[in-house]
A protein has these predicted regions:
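Short, conserved sequence motifs used for protein processing/export or organelle targeting and
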Residues: 2-204
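Short, solvent-exposed loop/linker segments at the N-terminal edge
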Residues: 85-90, 212-220, 233
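Asparagine-centered strand-capping/turn motif at beta-strand->loop junctions
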Residues: 98-100, 226-230
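Short acidic/proline- and small/hydrophobic-mixed sequence motifs that coincide with surface turns
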Residues: 104-107, 231-236
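Intrinsically disordered, low-complexity Pro/Gly/Ser/Thr-rich segments with frequent PxxP/GP/PP motifs
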Residues: 149-155, 247-274
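Enriched for extracellular/lumenal, surface-exposed ectodomains of secreted and cell-surface proteins
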Residues: 181-185, 243, 272, 279-295
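Terminal edge beta-strands and adjacent linker/stalk segments
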Residues: 193-196, 291-305
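Boundary/junction segments of secreted and surface-exposed precursor proteins
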Residues: 199-216, 304-312
Length: 312
């Protein structure tokens, strides 16, 4: 692999939900590299030179010759990265081995990032119009400060095991782990490695699409639209819901939604307090399978309770 990429999604110049999912880690790296505008790019920890009449750090100034030249530099390290999941597919476990080909000293740190190789949206999730995102950093392990490794002697291998209880992952099939050795004093990246996406993950994905939002009666029966993006019929779910910020309730649903089909689930009737706007939040939880896409399991809606006058 000649290039290993990490993208840190910021909250400027526009809104970005992927920044909101992990603000501390992004903010830390933005400060570390003194980023004041985006897009901004570094290669091996050094800002891209402005040799294309743009600005320092402009991604447009990166050429294939630049990449080839950087890849040709001999590194003192070899990095091997693998990852796996626990049985419930809720935790990712990371194993990194760093081997030095020669004695290496300095303020050395190992940085490890959980990334999603590809995230594609049907409509822009933010305010910049983009729908395609690649190599998005989701979590730095164990934190944005990385792991201090100490010096290496030639031939020495050091192993590191890290884990993360995952959140805000769009698709487990696209998870990759990027690990890189960096001199924290100079910010120079000395070597990087990346894991391959895990093979054999279950093809299971249930999505909550919408919930009914208009009612003429204070007696409101929420109806949730659910799509089964899996290869087998969906026969049971737990639907966790809350109205107007109240205590969450769980409705155990059984039935059948065919593979690739969309169905509806009617929740127990609730009484709304007064006309006007009310809020409902819904999450679907698989009880029999592993849902590889955990972000589309949630839906929220504002309920409009109409104040209808009854003629006398």
């Amino acid at each position: 692999v000649k290039v290993v990429s990490i993208k840190y999604q910021t909250n400027w110049p526009g809104v970005d939900p992927m920044y909101l999912q992990n603000e501390p880690d992004v903010d830390s790296r933005v400060g570390y590299y003194s980023v004041s505008g985006v897009p901004d790019a570094t290669m091996d920890g050094v800002h891209i030179a402005n040799d294309c009449a743009a600005y320092v750090g402009a991604p447009a100034c990166v050429s294939q010759d630049d990449i080839d030249a950087a890849a040709a530099i001999t590194s003192p390290f070899l990095i091997n990265v693998t990852h796996s999941f626990n049985a419930e597919y809720t935790t990712v476990n990371v194993h990194v081995e760093v081997t030095a080909g020669a004695d290496v000293a300095g303020t050395l740190k190992l940085q490890v990032a959980v990334t999603e190789k590809e995230i594609l949206f049907d409509t822009p999730p933010g305010s910049n119009g983009e729908t395609e995102f690649y190599g998005v950093m989701k979590k730095l392990l164990p934190s944005a400060t990385g792991t201090t490794t100490g010096a290496f002697y030639g031939g020495e291998t050091k192993s590191f095991d890290l884990s993360w209880d995952m959140s805000n992952i769009y698709n487990l099939n696209n998870i990759q782990i990027v690990a890189f050795m960096q001199d924290d004093a100079t910010k120079k990246v000395l070597q990087a490695g990346v894991s391959s996406p895990a093979a054999g993950l279950p093809v299971v994905d249930y999505a909550a699409n919408s919930v009914s939002a208009i009612t003429c009666s204070s007696e409101y029966t929420p109806v949730v639209s659910v799509t089964n993006n899996s290869a087998a019929a969906l026969t049971s779910l737990d639907v966790v819901y809350s109205i107007d910020g109240g205590a969450a309730a769980t409705y155990p649903w059984t039935g059948s939604i065919a593979a690739g089909a969309t169905g509806t689930i009617s929740l127990p009737t609730a009484t709304l307090a007064g006309a006007g706007a009310h809020d409902i939040e819904v999450e679907i939880v698989s009880v029999s399978d592993i849902d590889i896409n955990m972000v589309n399991d949630n839906v929220a809606s504002s309920i409009g309770l109409l104040d209808v006058a009854v003629p006398s």
